Amino acid sequence: DGIFPTVGAGDVWYGCGDGAVGIVAETPFASTTTNPA
């Protein structure tokens, strides 16, 4: 499961398998956060 706040927010939590989806859905900055995908 992934928790996605409004687009442009800094903090983004990724769930297993949702990492790639989160990176695409959120701003590029999200890719720098912890991504256990």
Swiss-Prot record:
Residues 1-26 are annotated as: Central domain. GO terms for molecular function: structural constituent of egg chorion. GO terms for cellular component: egg chorion. Transmembrane segments: none annotated. The keyword Repeat applies. Pfam families: Chorion_1. InterPro entries: Chorion. GO terms for biological process: chorion-containing eggshell formation. Residues 27-37 are annotated as: Right arm. Keywords: Repeat. This protein is one of many from the eggshell of the silk moth. Belongs to the chorion protein family. This is Chorion class CB protein PCH12. It comes from Antheraea polyphemus.
